[in-house]
């Protein structure tokens, strides 16, 4: 058991991510076990091993995407696993090329970009794109890579804690001088070449603020 004083000490120093806020909403016990007591477990079942394999693929994919967007080509392999990875990375390269063809150099790519608000809320974007016109920031596009194959529907994407937190933090920081309508978030599933776009409004921003700080 963790005593009340130790619990309060750790809570006061936590920086809250999307996963942490989601865990808190689901179960206070899960949150305390995972983020305060730091209890993690594995049952070594087939399902558990498959989960670890998927997580490993996801980590590799995100790392390779970061390299591509920084202009560092990933190493290619001939294994079946890496052929899937190469295919998925080629689809991310296509997104990069389309932006370059449309906006030229009037944009900047920020892969694995972390923002922390002063009230200890933190997010790390897979990719944040700043789009400029005449040297002035005019739009922000958030991209999140999803390696699972189950199709993400727009209605579900709009209600995800991740969506609401990522868009809120973006508006409160880099996008503070932008209209909400100039901030967008995209979920992209390269394995099935599926993309969902979520737009933003002032009403959504106020709703997200209320949801986040009442969690």
Predicted regions and their residues:
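Metal-dependent nuclease catalytic regions and adjoining charged, substrate-binding loops involved
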Residues: 111, 170-215
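Active-site catalytic microenvironments for nucleophilic, acid-base chemistry
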Residues: 67-71, 168-173
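Non-catalytic protein-protein interaction segments used by genome-maintenance enzymes to assemble
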Residues: 110-163, 171-174
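Glycine-rich, flexible loop segments associated with nucleotide phosphate handling
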Residues: 50-55, 137-141, 180-184, 210
């Amino acid at each position: 058991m963790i005593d009340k004083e130790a619990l309060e000490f750790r809570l006061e120093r936590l920086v809250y991510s999307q996963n942490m806020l989601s865990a808190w909403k689901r179960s206070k016990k899960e949150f305390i076990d995972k983020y305060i007591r730091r209890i993690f477990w594995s049952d070594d079942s087939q399902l558990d091993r498959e989960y670890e394999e998927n997580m490993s693929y996801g980590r590799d994919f995100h790392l390779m995407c970061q390299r591509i967007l920084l202009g560092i080509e990933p190493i290619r392999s001939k294994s079946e696993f890496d052929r899937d990875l190469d295919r998925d990375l080629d689809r991310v390269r296509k997104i990069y090329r389309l932006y370059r063809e449309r906006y030229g150099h009037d944009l900047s790519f920020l892969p694995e970009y972390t923002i922390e608000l002063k009230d200890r809320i933190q997010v790390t974007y897979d990719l944040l794109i700043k789009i400029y016109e005449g040297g002035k920031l005019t739009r922000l596009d958030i991209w999140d890579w999803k390696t699972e194959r189950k199709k993400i529907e727009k209605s579900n994407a709009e209600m995800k804690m991740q969506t609401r937190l990522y868009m809120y933090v973006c508006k409160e920081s880099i996008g503070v001088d932008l209209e909400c309508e100039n901030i967008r978030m995209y979920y992209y599933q390269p394995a099935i070449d599926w993309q969902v776009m979520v737009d933003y409004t002032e009403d959504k921003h106020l709703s997200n603020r209320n949801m986040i700080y009442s969690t």
